[in-house]
């Protein structure tokens, strides 16, 4: 059977630029909304993405969508086609800016990033999702660390974070978390399961200062 998909765009104003009778750019301003369908190289549906923001800019190359950029209260929801993609749950995300690189299958979120997947929430300054590998990379800034929160668990914060969306495992660099009345800090924290972590070069302390006065190593 043949599957037909129709991408949708809505907004208060839509500007379209053509070059040599080919679509070059589309700019959506004011309450921008877009729905686009994701297909593999055999044209099978892998899922669809809903996105909203103050402005949405779409850039085309050779008549095909190349990049999609959303600015201002950018939000998105990815709905996977169950059975055709390894992503097995809806993924919600929001940030100040979202940039989609269609051909490279990369999504990058900038500033005030929050992502919800299964029972896990990630907060960070910058996040890149590589859909080729289904890996997520979070990078903190100087003022605020990346933070991952699993349902029923204490938050874990760190400078950089790598997370596999398929097996739910991850690595947190320069991480820290609360356990009971104390705190663990570690150069690297490996997340094996939502409640199982392995730490490398770690310390334990009940002192809540950034540089604890005492600790066990």
Language-model features: where?
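Structural signature for solvent-exposed beta-strand/loop edge elements and short helix-capping sites
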Residues: 1-217
């Amino acid at each position: 059977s043949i599957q037909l998909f129709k991408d949708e765009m809505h907004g208060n104003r839509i500007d379209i630029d053509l070059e040599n009778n080919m679509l070059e750019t589309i700019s959506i301003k004011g309450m921008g909304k877009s729905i686009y369908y994701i297909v593999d190289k055999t044209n099978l549906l892998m899922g669809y993405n809903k996105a909203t923001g103050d402005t949405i800019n779409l850039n085309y190359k050779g008549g095909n969508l190349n990049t999609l950029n959303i600015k201002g209260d950018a939000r998105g929801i990815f709905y996977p086609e169950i059975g055709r993609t390894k992503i097995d749950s809806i993924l919600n995300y929001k940030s100040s800016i979202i940039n989609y690189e269609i051909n490279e299958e990369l999504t990058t979120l900038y500033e005030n990033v929050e992502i919800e997947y299964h029972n896990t929430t990630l907060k960070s300054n910058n996040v890149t999702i590589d859909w080729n590998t289904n890996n997520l990379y979070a990078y903190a800034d100087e003022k605020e660390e990346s933070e991952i929160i699993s349902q029923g668990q204490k938050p874990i914060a760190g400078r950089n974070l790598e997370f596999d969306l398929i097996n739910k495992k991850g690595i947190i660099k320069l991480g820290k978390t609360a356990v009971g009345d104390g705190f663990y800090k570690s150069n690297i924290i490996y997340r094996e399961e939502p409640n199982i972590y392995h730490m490398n070069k770690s310390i334990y302390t009940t002192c809540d200062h950034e540089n604890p006065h005492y600790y066990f190593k």
